Amino acid sequence: KFADKEENRQLVWNFLQPYLSDEREFFVRFGTVMLLSHFVDEEHIDSVLRLMEGVRHEGYYAKMVVAWTLSVCYVKFPEKTEKILRNGSLDNFTQNKTIQKIRESYRVSKEDKQRLNLLKRK
C-alpha cells in the first residue's frame, strides 16, 4: 500500500492534516479513518491522540470516527489514551461514545471497562 511504504509515510501524514480541520464532515472522516488505518502506532500515537483532541466538527459521522479511532488507540495504547478521557478535552458525545466503543471491545479487560465507565458524562 502506498501509505504504508516508509518512503511515503511523511508525505501521506502531511497530506492528511488539512482534512482533520476541514468544514466538510466527510473530509474530516476520511482524514481520521486514514490516520486510524495507517498511523495508530508507537511512532505516531502521541500525535494521533493530540489530533483527535483537536477535531472540532459537530457532525455525527465526524464525532463517531473520532470515538472509533480513540477506542482503537485505547486497545493499543491504553495508558496514553485514558489520559485523554480523563483530561476533559472531548465533548460529551465523543467522550461517551469512545467509552461505549471501548466497552464493546473484546480486547479490553472487564476491570478497565468498569473503570472507564466511571468517566462517562451525563
At which residue positions do the language-model features occur?
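Alpha-helical scaffold domains
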Residues: 1-122
